[in-house]
Every structure is written in structure tokens, then in C-alpha cells.
């Protein structure tokens, strides 16, 4: 395989499912960015969101950019919806090569004050959904005959928790799930990796409002002193799904501007 060309991502003509691919209004979240970038590289994209209008907004952007995409409404915590989602990709596009799992919710409690029902819901949305989407996507990838690749979105909270116990546990489970899937399905030619975003500025983050001070604090958490965006995560996803990552599986790509390395100042005692 000749990978000398920087443009040869191996995505042209392939089919990707991007769950959580919608966004508020014209905002660019992680999933929407990934869907747009995959389409720009020639992939056909099934954009999945619980709210059909959010998925349709992403599809409209892709088509305006000259790409091919279709919208699908699904609750990825529902097994039947996950089955139907994969069936839709196979029916509309004839094959399936990639899955990008973006769906997730947050929580702020400790083990003492987090209600058990909240813990269970976070684990269902953040972990079980990826189990279910993969359960049906992997056989379709095998049927399509060229292997495939999956990217699951974790978080730096899995690597260096700052409290947020339930959320951190769920995102750690995403990494372990991905590693186990990589072992199980490597022989099928299917690669499975994670992206662990840092404090990126996306519609999910600012939906309920964010002060300039809070936004600045998030930016300053980066060693680079810059703000992460949905595009940064989308580019990482596209790379891991592409031929450029053909020898990478079971890994977690941290995209945080160095935030996980942040500690005491160098001259502290």
C-alpha cells in the first residue's frame, strides 16, 4: 500500500456512521466536525442524532460543501434503534466501513452525593451506547469485506480525573471497552481507537451559557494557551479512521493542548 500521498486518506467512497453528529443551530460539535471532515475526504456519511433536525442540519452543511450524507434519528441507548441505524447505512449506501461514537452526557457528583439513577444513566449513555452501536456495526463492516475502523470518544477525565466521579468512570470504561474490542476484532481487520478530548469549546459545553472568565480558564488549562474546538476532535477522528492510521489500534489519542500535563509551576517547591 502506497501511503506517500498526504491526500490519500483512503476515505473516498467509504461509508461512515457518525453518532451524535448533530449540533445546536450552526454550531460545530465534535460529531458534526467529524462528519463534515469525513465527507470532505470523500466518505458518505450517515449522520445520526436523537433529534432528526440536528442531524439534518449537519447533512445540509455536508451537501452544501459538495458531499454525500443522509440523516437518521436514533436513540443509541436503544438496541432496536442501533440495529435500525446500521440497517439504514447498509440500505442507503450499500456498505459500512467506519463508526464514530460521539454521544455522551456529563455529571458532577461524587460517590457520596451522586444519585444511583444518575450513575446508571451516565453509564448507559456513555458506555452502553457504544457497546450497542458496535454490536451491530461490526458485523456490517465484516460483511462489507474491507475491514473497518471505530473511534470512540472518551475524555481526559478518564486519564487524570478531577472529581466528576461518574463521568470519569464512564469515560475510563470507554477506553477499556475500545481496547477489548480491538483485541476481539483485530483478526477481522477492524481497528478500534479512542480520542480523549480536553476542554474543547463546543455547543454541548456552551448550551447553558459560559462566562468569559470560565471560557478563559478552560483555555488557560492548555499548555499552548489556545482554545480547543470541535474541529480539533474531528481531525483526530478522521486521522484514526483513515489509512494513515492503518497500523494503529487499541490506542487513545489525547487531544487537549497538553492539559493533562499541567501541574505545579516548574519553580514550585
Regions found by a protein language model. Name each.
Residues 110-111, 115-120, 218:
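Substrate-binding pocket helix/loop in short-chain dehydrogenase/reductase
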Residues 139, 183-187, 246:
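Alpha-helical segment proximal to the catalytic Tyr-Lys
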Residues 7, 176, 194, 213-248, ...:
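C-terminal helical subdomain
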Residues 134, 170, 178:
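Active-site helix of classical SDR
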Residues 155:
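Residue(s) in the substrate-gating loop at a strand-loop-helix junction
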Residues 2-7, 238, 249-269:
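Short C-terminal tail/terminal secondary-structure segment
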Residues 10-46:
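Canonical Rossmann dinucleotide-binding motif of NAD(H)/NADP(H)-dependent dehydrogenases/reductases
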